[in-house]
């Protein structure tokens, strides 16, 4: 049965009425960019998550896919895999630079073409190149991450989005092919201290430069390894992009030790607008897709769930950074 056939009657009525209204209001939307995290029925209709797979045939997996993301990770379902190698980060020994954007949906950092940042190891059989760092956050603390652990959300989630550079020439091609993408997720809590990498992105001089949609600010001399905890475990599963077209080509790697930012930094994020300055303010917060069924997919981890009290010790629980001292 197709996605449209499975659509509930009330939702179908809302969709068709909104589509009819949208056809008479202003220019036609770009079909590749016509989506939102919340259904906007005040003015132009913009389809939220329940409608993604219905308004564009290329996004059908958003409605009918069986390996969709994000998911709720129940730790009792995680299979301990002692043969998972540590994660490895390669920056060529150089500092990261790039542009921080307010896309109207996310806070997004796009790295410059050089240096090339790669991640490998863990469940990855190939080297994957960093394409984007994306920050998702909620309107209230404890409810901003896409993924959950044991039904518990976090205030924010940082996603490092990579494509397989050994098999594909660019992100677009990789998103359509097997073993195409890898996304590392780090959870974020609100506390009295702040992760040093996130502090560079969220300090007042930086975050106020991207207050509105399409604002951008160039950053340099960033040390990406500072984003990661000193030691951590990870959980991996096969899933999808959590935005249209919801391609099921993603190896997700969830870092199991959360980062911190301050309440002031979180407040600054919530003051970012998803609209340009000429339009009414709407907070960028709440930019996450609802949870998707895990179904029969396997969850693997490098930490033995039979002994959760044990601390992560040894090289397998550290990020290996090429050229950095002490295995970092």
Swiss-Prot record:
Compositional bias per record (Basic and acidic residues), positions renumbered to this chain: 319-328
Q: Which GO terms describe its biological process?
A: one-carbon metabolic process
One GO molecular-function entry:
zinc ion binding
Q: Which UniProt keywords apply?
A: Glycoprotein, Secreted, Signal
Q: Which is one Pfam family of this protein? A: Carb_anhydrase
The record's comment on protein family reads: Belongs to the alpha-carbonic anhydrase family.
Function field: Does not have a catalytic activity.
Q: What is this protein called?
A: Carbonic anhydrase-related protein 11
Gene symbol here is CA11
């Amino acid at each position: 049965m197709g996605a449209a056939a499975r659509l509930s009657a009330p939702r179908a009525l809302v969709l068709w009425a909104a589509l009819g209204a949208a056809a008479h209001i202003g220019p036609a939307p770009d079909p590749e960019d016509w989506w939102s995290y919340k259904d906007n029925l005040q003015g132009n209709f913009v389809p939220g998550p329940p409608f993604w797979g219905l308004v564009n045939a290329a996004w059908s997996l958003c409605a009918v896919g069986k390996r969709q993301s994000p998911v709720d990770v129940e730790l009792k379902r995680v299979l301990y895999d002692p043969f998972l190698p540590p994660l490895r980060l390669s920056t060529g020994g150089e500092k990261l630079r790039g542009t921080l954007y307010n896309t109207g949906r996310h806070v997004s950092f796009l790295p410059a073409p050089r240096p090339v940042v790669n991640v490998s190891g863990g469940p990855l059989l190939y080297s994957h190149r960093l394409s984007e760092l994306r920050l998702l956050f909620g309107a209230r603390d404890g409810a901003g991450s896409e993924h959950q652990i044991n039904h518990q959300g976090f205030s924010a989630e940082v996603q490092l989005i990579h494509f397989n550079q050994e098999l594909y020439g660019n992100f677009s091609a990789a998103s359509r092919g097997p073993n195409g993408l890898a996304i590392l997720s780090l959870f974020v809590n609100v506390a009295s201290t702040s992760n040093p990498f996130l502090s560079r992105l969220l300090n007042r001089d930086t975050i106020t430069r991207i207050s509105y949609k399409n604002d951008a600010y160039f950053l340099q001399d960033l040390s990406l390894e500072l984003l990661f905890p000193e030691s951590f475990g990870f959980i991996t599963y096969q899933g999808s992009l959590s935005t249209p077209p919801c391609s099921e080509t993603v190896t997700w790697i969830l870092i199991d030790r959360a980062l911190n930012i301050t309440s002031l930094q979180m407040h600054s994020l919530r003051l970012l607008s998803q609209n340009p300055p000429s339009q009414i303010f709407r907070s960028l917060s709440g930019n996450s897709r609802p949870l998707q069924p895990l179904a029969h997919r396997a969850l693997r981890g490098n930490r033995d769930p039979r002994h959760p009290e044990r601390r992560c010790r040894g090289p397998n629980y550290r990020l290996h950074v090429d050229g950095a001292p002490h295995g970092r």
